[in-house]
Amino acid sequence: MPSTFDSKLFLKTVSSSPGVYRMYDEEGTVIYVGKAKDLKKRLSSYFRVNLPNVKTQALVSHIANIDVTVTHSETDALILENDYIKQYMPRYNVLLRDDKSYPYILLSDHKHPRLAYHRGPKRDKGSYFGPYPNGGAVRESLHLLQKIFPIRQCDDLYYKSRSRPCLQYQIGRCSAPCVNKVSDEEYAVQVKLASLFLKGKDLQVMTELVSKMEASALALEYEQAASYRDQIAALRRVAEQQEVSNTSGDMDVIGAYYASGVACFHLLFIREGKIFGSRSYYPSVPAETELDEVLSAFMIQFYLNSDSQRTVPKEILLSHGFDDLPELERAIQTALEKKVEIKTNVRSERANFLRLAVTNATNAVNTRLSHKNTVEQRFLLLEEALEVSTLIQRMECFDISHTMGESTVASCVVFDREGPNKADYRRYNINGITPGDDYAAMKQAITRRFDKIDKNGKIPDLLFIDGGTGQLRIAQKIVDEKFVDIDKTPMLIGVAKGEGRKPGLETLIYGENEQSFTIPADSGALHLIQHIRDESHRFAITGHRNKRQKTRNTSTLESIAGVGPKRRKALLQYLGGIQEVKGASVAELAKVPGISLEMAQTIHDSLRG
């Protein structure tokens, strides 16, 4: 492999998101295009010591550069990969392989058929619709079908055990054939219509529903006619949404992201509804420039550049608005002598395209901020600003996150001279403190981090505390205690938010003497501090949200001895939810499959306290 390509450095900048990668040779020719569910995992596999086959060895030996485009889903990655393969015809692309089975929607062959998610061998009798690109697409379709056709989606065990309608019947998403709330004939009609809809025969479904509504009205069956009317309305809403989401025509989609002095504009070029290509632009941004000014300057220079010979589409989607946008739109129309619309508030597929562009812009900025040369330069500037005599090799930053004291989590992120060192990131679940006590939370986190530290451990040269003097003082006290017998001691610095929490106005505080100081807003040293502070905040809040969601999702049934996952599922499905389980009598609990009278009594007593 050419020495100009550093795979280790490159892999540190790659995320674990789904996406597409393009490999180039020394002449800049695309030699391979691939997709991955996890870009980091897939790309890492190319640079193992023992590669699996000769083709891969030959491919890797010609790699001079790799370009990555993040997508929101594997489906987006697949579409973009196909487009790139058609465009570049790379010599190492032979075929597209996917060893995973594709999911389907199953319309079962029962007296009262059900709609269900299916993946794997088609052993069950019934009609299969698909394949769908992924499980999410199937679940979204099933959710949509529930709104239009009141067909059951429950499994057979749940269906056979019902003695009363479930919640789906009460909200109008199932006709409850399990307890004879609908005739077999009418249920069969709905099954037929759902089957036609899944085959794409929307017009035929609409025609039949209108015919049945009119027939019911003539027969004075007004309630049934009203039901058909509601179905027609739901079907029309879906048709309208599909018309918007099936995007056609040409668009430029621009996602912007600006952080720590680096701006990126990621453009998706949509032609005839497909992603034709993408490109990132990095304008040079003077210090303390507002985002509005960056946006305006880029749009003007990009679209009013007569030398570029670019074809400007009639529709431009932009992730952020700014004050001069209407004027810019008029200027472009005047220069091009045609109508051009710049939109910032869009929905459906257009919104998905915008999110995709912003994701790629964000990823590009983070990659730039993580780049070795950029980080190295900022480390040097930080050493100069702090007037330290030795190199800063390792920095750590702590932050606390909670919601009104709930599910408190502390984060510790680590930067070295190549940027974020995610392998050393740590989260600490904070317990045993007064809810909302950030000082106690910080004390616990710092104590746990350095509890068994010795001279051979990973000792940071700099330790940043995201907070004011109070939290910094506690952290300094813990560090002084833990490092009493160790020669090397980290320098502590507090990062206090500035007025209005605006970046560039932060106040820095030395932990040793609590003296405050500032660094110019346009300094790379401050940008480095902002980067590690923001990363610590992101890592803390992500952990907090996950912990909070897990806590809130934990059913009270889990605390009852003898009630495992299968029994919990049976109880919740049979009775319709946790509130119904709590309100059930011992006799009602005992009717649930797998629940004995003795177990029913235990559950009843436990829930009633």
UniProtKB/Swiss-Prot annotation:
Protein name: UvrABC system protein C
Residue intervals of the GIY-YIG domain: 16-94
Stretches assigned to coiled coil: none
Principal location class: cytoplasm
Tree of life domain: Bacteria
Organism the protein comes from: Shewanella sediminis (strain HAW-EB3)
GO molecular function: DNA binding; excinuclease ABC activity
Lineage, highest ranks first: Bacteria, Pseudomonadati, Pseudomonadota, Gammaproteobacteria, Alteromonadales
Name of the gene this protein is made from: uvrC
Domain UVR: residue ranges: 203-238
